[in-house]
């Protein structure tokens, strides 16, 4: 194993599958293997469009995309990869939440190991959401402000986020609206989310309801 480490400031998109622990207890391992294989295939399909900009690491129910450099050109690539990956998962009925952060990371051991403040930040903001959302953490929105990029132009909304533990909403957190512009039809994700809500355990249904209400509120119909 090559122990060489590379340290730099990076964009990180951290995704966590919802309900995976329950599936481990109730589903055959071959079923989970097939589901994870499908998710990995989708992740690889998105990353291969940006081979010089984005890479990934995965373990258990966690999937991480990260930029290969701190250059501003890597942000659009990571954003495209992250949003399309999340939408693909929901279309397949796979529940997940995600967050995008920015900061120092170190990648080593043949890219099998990742440490750094940005990794911790993305993990904390991802795990704390109480819906199926993709957010920009304050480290990400702060870096975008320095780059003079308005996240609202890329489908993000500044609105209160449903947290699991946090008692206040950080004004620098933005949520992805799943809307990239005006459309003449409702969001195609809504039907799948409603189906997923019907199948979800009673204690998890509110996560889907919050997501559906958020998308309906911000989807722009011509």
Task: Outline where the language-model segments fall.
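Intrinsically disordered, glycine/charged-rich C-terminal tails and inter-domain linkers
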Residues: 2, 131-132, 136-222
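Short, hydrophobic/aromatic alpha-helical segments in well-folded domains
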Residues: 81-85, 101, 121
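Residues immediately flanking
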Residues: 17, 102, 138
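A short glycine-enriched loop-to-beta-strand structural element that forms part of the catalytic core
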Residues: 61-62, 66, 94-108
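Catalytic NTP-binding/metal-coordinating core of nucleotidyl cyclase/transferase enzymes
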Residues: 1-91
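Catalytic-core segments of nucleotide cyclases and related cyclic-nucleotide turnover enzymes
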Residues: 79, 107-126
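Catalytic/regulatory signature loops of cyclic-dinucleotide turnover enzymes
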Residues: 91, 97, 119-140
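Residues that scaffold the ATP/ADP-binding catalytic core of kinase and kinase-like folds
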Residues: 23, 108, 144
